[in-house]
């Protein structure tokens, strides 16, 4: 017969093991008499994009490039050893203009996040001739910044957030490109000292008729190219400089051209008036019959007849209008009857080489009198 201790010892061992294990509490809804709740299906998890800390959160500046042979070269930029007067700081995620060495004449700062130009922006580099600030976020320019750059010739500030044309522009400026901003104001007299300006680009802004006063362009004696396309003009701008060669007014809301408007431009060779609201009623008979005009764009308007042209015009775009018929005798700059006798006189032959008439109400064939007049035509689209 076994001793009671033989039975007691295994029981003590089991009790000690049970005390060492944690006690599990029953889950809610799993007690006796209750049905277990179904487990929710796991929802698929997709990586969520990191939200910026603030709406204007910008990418960090890029790390400095390789060491330069020029000790004054900003770490954020590149100084080409074979072009010591140039400084390339473009596409570096910069928030402000770095310290520019005095030796720099050509400065490239496009494709950054610069928001303003304080007075000290170019204080060391007064010999700058070329500045490219395209595609930044510039809203504010200190008036004293540019007046301290007497040798500046080219200023590019396209694709920024300017609301008016900068003041105190250097008098030696030759090209001013301010397209794709928010410009709706032109300060009085801002161009008055820019006698050397050749190109003024103000396309894709918010310029209306009220912005242009009779003296807005005063001082631009040598301006050759004026671009006012993609604005909200309803009228032709007044007192455009008479030295103009190229005039861009596409994509406005212009309905009429004053009688004799272009007569005061002896050098005007290129006109673009596509995508406006021009009609025959708003076009005086000889609006474009000016001596030096070579290229005329009038597509995407509401014109129903071909306007009179000069003998030297080479390219005429009249596509996408309301033209129903075309008469070569009426639009020919020369008398067709006299033309037969002097067919070999190329000096008097109209110079038109390209004529576009598609998108109207015309149908082939091309009228014979049209071909007899414009004998140098190389392409007619109808």
Curated annotation (Swiss-Prot):
Comment text on domains: The basic N-terminal Arg/Pro-rich region binds heparin and heparan sulfate. Binds collagens type I and type II through its leucine-rich repeat domain.
Region (Disordered): 19-66
Record Pfam families: LRR_8
Protein name (database record): Prolargin
Sorted UniProt keywords: Disulfide bond, Extracellular matrix, Glycoprotein, Heparan sulfate, Heparin-binding, Leucine-rich repeat, Proteoglycan, Repeat, Secreted, Signal
Post-translational modification summary for this protein: Glycosylated; contains heparan sulfate.
Segments of skewed composition (Pro residues): 41-50, 57-66
Species assigned in the record: Homo sapiens (Human)
Quaternary context: Binds the basement membrane heparan sulfate proteoglycan perlecan and triple helical collagens type I and type II.
Lineage: Eukaryota, Metazoa, Chordata, Craniata, Vertebrata
Biological process terms in GO annotation: cellular senescence; skeletal system development
Disulfide bonds: 332-373
InterPro entries: Leu-rich_rpt, Leu-rich_rpt_typical-subtyp, LRR_dom_sf, LRRNT, SLRP
């Amino acid at each position: 017969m076994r001793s009671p201790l033989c039975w007691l010892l295994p029981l003590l061992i089991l009790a000690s093991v049970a005390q060492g294990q944690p006690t599990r509490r029953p889950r809610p809804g799993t007690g006796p008499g209750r049905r277990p709740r179904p487990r929710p299906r796991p929802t698929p998890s997709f990586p969520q994009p990191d939200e910026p800390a603030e709406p204007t959160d910008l990418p960090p500046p890029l790390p400095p490039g390789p060491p330069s042979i020029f000790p004054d070269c900003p770490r954020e930029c590149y100084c080409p050893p074979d072009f010591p007067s140039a400084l390339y700081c473009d596409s570096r995620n910069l928030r402000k203009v770095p310290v520019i060495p005095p030796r720099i004449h050509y400065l490239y700062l496009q494709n950054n996040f610069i928001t303003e130009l304080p007075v000290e922006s170019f204080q060391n580099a007064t010999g700058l001739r070329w500045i490219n600030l395209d595609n930044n976020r510039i809203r504010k320019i200190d008036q004293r910044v540019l007046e301290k750059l007497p040798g500046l010739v080219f200023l590019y500030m396209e694709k920024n957030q300017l609301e008016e044309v900068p003041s105190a522009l250097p008098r030696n400026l030759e090209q001013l490109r301010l397209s794709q901003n928010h410009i709706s104001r032109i300060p009085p007299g801002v161009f008055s000292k820019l006698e050397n300006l050749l190109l003024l680009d103000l396309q894709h802004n918010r310029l209306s008729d009220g912005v242009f006063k009779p003296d807005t362009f005063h001082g631009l004696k040598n301006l050759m190219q004026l671009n006012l396309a993609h604005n909200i003009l309803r009228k032709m701008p007044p007192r455009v400089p008479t030295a103009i060669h190229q005039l861009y007014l596409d994509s406005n809301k212009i309905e009429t051209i004053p009688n004799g408007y272009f007569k005061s431009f002896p050098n005007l060779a290129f006109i673009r008036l596509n995508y406006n609201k021009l009609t025959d009623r708003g076009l005086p008979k000889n609006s474009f019959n000016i001596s030096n005009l070579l290229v005329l764009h009038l597509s995407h308007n509401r014109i129903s007849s071909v306007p009179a042209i000069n003998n030297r015009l080479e390219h005429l775009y009249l596509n996408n209008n309301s033209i129903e018929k075309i008469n070569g005798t009426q639009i020919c700059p020369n008398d067709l009857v006299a033309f037969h006798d002097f067919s070999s006189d190329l000096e008097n032959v109209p110079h038109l080489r390209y004529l576009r008439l598609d998108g109207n109400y015309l149908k082939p064939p091309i009228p014979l009198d049209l071909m007899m007049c414009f004998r140098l035509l190389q392409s007619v689209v109808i």
